[in-house]
Regions:
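Beta-propeller blade signature
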Residues: 76-86, 129-143, 186-195
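Blade-loop segments of beta-propeller domains
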Residues: 78-113, 119
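Beta-strand-rich domains and repeat architectures in extracellular enzymes and scaffolds
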Residues: 43-76
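Short glycine/acidic-enriched loop and turn motifs that connect beta-strands
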Residues: 71-75, 111, 120-126, 180-185
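Repeated scaffold domains used in trafficking and secretory/extracellular systems
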Residues: 50-58, 96-107, 153-169
Length: 196
């Protein structure tokens, strides 16, 4: 597909062609362009912890699904849930005041799992939390009776950036953080091993 790109004020324009490969040299464009059907569904009809929006998800190499869900009537909460496809999550942990949960990533380290997520969210006028100022790497510790506040684990601050969202690629030693400045969205790349 061809994707147009532009600055918010349209002062700079670009067009890029994107080709997606599945590692075998085959393009996935044909697969992704066919009509939606049951063969494309990985998991369905899963009830999460709250009757609220799932903000994002990740999938482990073994197929385990991870969900990030808003707290509903508890706007300061995010739920990180883990489970098998087509099944209710087996456990979860709660994060308080982290932000909106727009994105997160799961890092696999042997039998341990770590969550990379925006943290230190700001309370907005509508009572919701958003615009995280830091990124945290948290050891996944499911406990239904404990809430982790603001940040935890290893926490990283990028000066003059907000609304930060991490992504990782452990195979290629990449940590990417997308963040906002005034009117611009930045993509900042680091070696993951430098952060650890």
């Amino acid at each position: 597909p061809v994707l147009p790109c532009a600055m918010p004020d349209n002062s700079v324009h670009a067009t890029t062609r994107v080709t997606v490969h599945d590692g075998t040299g085959e393009s996935l464009a044909a697969e992704l362009s066919r009509p939606f059907d049951d063969a494309l569904v990985y998991s369905r009809s899963v009830y999460l912890q709250r009757n609220t929006i799932m903000q994002s998800f990740d999938i482990e190499t073994d197929g385990t699904l991870w969900y990030l869900q808003l707290g509903g009537n508890d706007p300061e909460l995010l739920y990180v849930l883990r489970g098998a496809p087509n099944e209710s999550p087996k456990d979860y942990m709660m994060l308080r005041w982290f932000g909106h949960g727009t994105n997160f990533a799961v890092e696999e380290q042997g039998t341990e799992r770590y969550i990379w997520i925006g943290s230190n969210g700001n309370k907005l006028s509508d009572g919701s939390y958003s615009q995280s100022n830091t990124v945290s790497r948290l050891k996944y510790s499911p406990d239904k009776n404990r809430k982790l506040d603001l940040c935890g684990g290893d926490t990283f601050f990028i000066k003059d950036k907000w609304n930060v969202h991490p992504a990782i690629d452990t195979d290629n030693d990449i940590l990417c953080i997308t963040a906002s400045t005034t009117g611009v969205r930045d993509f900042i790349f680091y070696r993951l091993s430098d952060a650890l």
